[in-house]
Amino acid sequence: MAHVRGLQLPGCLALAALCSLVHSQHVFLAPQQARSLLQRVRRANTFLEEVRKGNLERECVEETCSYEEAFEALESSTATDVFWAKYTACETARTPRDKLAACLEGNCAEGLGTNYRGHVNITRSGIECQLWRSRYPHKPEINSTTHPGADLQENFCRNPDSSTTGPWCYTTDPTVRRQECSIPVCGQDQVTVAMTPRSEGSSVNLSPPLEQCVPDRGQQYQGRLAVTTHGLPCLAWASAQAKALSKHQDFNSAVQLVENFCRNPDGDEEGVWCYVAGKPGDFGYCDLNYCEEAVEEETGDGLDEDSDRAIEGRTATSEYQTFFNPRTFGSGEADCGLRPLFEKKSLEDKTERELLESYIDGRIVEGSDAEIGMSPWQVMLFRKSPQELLCGASLISDRWVLTAAHCLLYPPWDKNFTENDLLVRIGKHSRTRYERNIEKISMLEKIYIHPRYNWRENLDRDIALMKLKKPVAFSDYIHPVCLPDRETAASLLQAGYKGRVTGWGNLKETWTANVGKGQPSVLQVVNLPIVERPVCKDSTRIRITDNMFCAGYKPDEGKRGDACEGDSGGPFVMKSPFNNRWYQMGIVSWGEGCDRDGKYGFYTHVFRLKKWIQKVIDQFGE
């Protein structure tokens, strides 16, 4: 500015002070007089402006200002940092004044566009931007912690790293990590980059077009589709190979197995399928648009009075029917879900009553330490080199482990692990300590990822099986969980009923290194209520399918809890009041942040995919 900043005496004030000094008998001024002389005085543009707080428009818009002058006007370090980032970006636009004002407002881009603070959230090709706070589908290396002054709000386009292409964002398309946005240029009739919409079919399909759907998972389908989703031709049902494979299968005789057309004779929740040429037992699913039918809507409205009595301790017996072939599945199913240190000793753990009572009343953040032996089916998926915890998983027999597909394969995070990259640690309680004589370390023989796992869009069918090289011995700390049948899924998967999530994931959402209080020392447990499907769908822009459900507390419920990074792949379990067994209803899949208001954790619906589990185990279990 034109004048010198510092201590100044305006004309009349200086004259008065001089007169006081001349006529005074004292050399030094009284404290009150001294303070009045040393008070900083601003140049007046209007009458009495000396006594106002700093005026940002006068200081920095009408004339050039320094950081200190901006701070004096704003009186806040945070506000000054945000303003200064925009101001330095707009400095080249000092004239005309209206251009600088527009630049500071942030609704247009100046230079590299680091000043932009508008609400555009679509990239130049029409892809919706990913939330800056989210790690899905991409893990951002730039966030509000690394760039606190960049105003990384919601999913608005910004330029925190001074990219030469202007404001940009991470995208919701897993195949496109980041892309620039088309932003108006300050003072010009143009944009930073031109819009170039992608051709149809290449963008993320957040709202697929409606078309006639096939009901009942295709069990009544009579069409002529005869090719799998991978383009393989179906074998004729009357062929020798297909007949041999179906000989011991429990097929519905009402389903007509005509020629080589895709059919659903075994009630597979995945829909129609067929055998294909290749290894004995090879099969493939066929691509149809199925009507969404929630399991809980198909067979009932939850538990009845009998279950209330069971919860109250009067009756709790129900014969357990095994589902898998022990020759391929291994041992453990007949005894599944009955924990050696609890049910087998007629003991309850400290929080299971909360789950059972919820059936009557209708990443673990805010969780607590699990009791030893509380979750004996919990498995730690461990990377060999560098050694690190990758995910959770669950033991379903002495040979098979269940986890989320994205723990093994997720290209946006450079994940594509093989059996040689990983091992599993079973029976653990401590996150880091080797628990001698308690935990078992097992190598993997083979990984099987669901063939229709959709990492490109929404993690649909986020499920994988891992076969152990050698069967693991059961103990007080190692025991398999049950997988639900239709009746169990229909009765327990009700909105408001609580399930349990366990894991060694982060205790809170953080962008900093996972050290100290950010990670637990022992296995964590949290009980979470299942949420109504419409609420789940309304909580996110991501397309939700009937292979998913969500759980968590609503903002007005007064309780908190969620799975967090590191809990992925772990089990969501519920205890049946009918037979006192624990069932794995879900697999920790994805969420937008950890324990955020209005956001919920999403889980793979295990029962929906149980027939796929059976087919894989029957084919590769020997």
From Swiss-Prot:
Domain Kringle, chain residue ranges per copy: 108-186, 213-291
Residue ranges of domain Peptidase S1 in the record: 364-618
Result of altering residue 425 to C: In FA2D; Quick-1
Enzyme class: hydrolase
Record localization: Secreted, Extracellular space
Extent of the signal sequence: 1-24
Summary of the tissues where the protein is detected: Expressed by the liver and secreted in plasma.
PROSITE patterns per record: GLA_1, GLA_2, KRINGLE_1, KRINGLE_2, TRYPSIN_DOM, TRYPSIN_HIS, TRYPSIN_SER
UniProt PTM comment: The gamma-carboxyglutamyl residues, which bind calcium ions, result from the carboxylation of glutamyl residues by a microsomal enzyme, the vitamin K-dependent carboxylase. The modified residues are necessary for the calcium-dependent interaction with a negatively charged phospholipid surface, which is essential for the conversion of prothrombin to thrombin.
An annotated Gene Ontology molecular function: serine-type endopeptidase activity
Record InterPro entries: GLA-like_dom_SF (IPR035972), GLA_domain (IPR000294), Kringle (IPR000001), Kringle-like (IPR013806), Kringle_CS (IPR018056), Kringle_sf (IPR038178), Peptidase_S1_PA (IPR009003), Peptidase_S1_PA_chymotrypsin (IPR043504)
UniProt EC number: 3.4.21.5
GO cellular component, one term: blood microparticle
Pfam families in UniProt: Gla (PF00594), Kringle (PF00051), Thrombin_light (PF09396), Trypsin (PF00089)
Disulfide bond entries: 60-65, 90-103, 108-186, 129-169, 157-181, 213-291, 234-274, 262-286, 336-482, 391-407, 536-550, 564-594
Site (Cleavage): 198-199, 314-315, 363-364
Anything else known: It is not known whether 1 or 2 smaller activation peptides, with additional cleavage after Arg-314, are released in natural blood clotting.
Official protein name in the record: Prothrombin
Organism the protein comes from: Homo sapiens
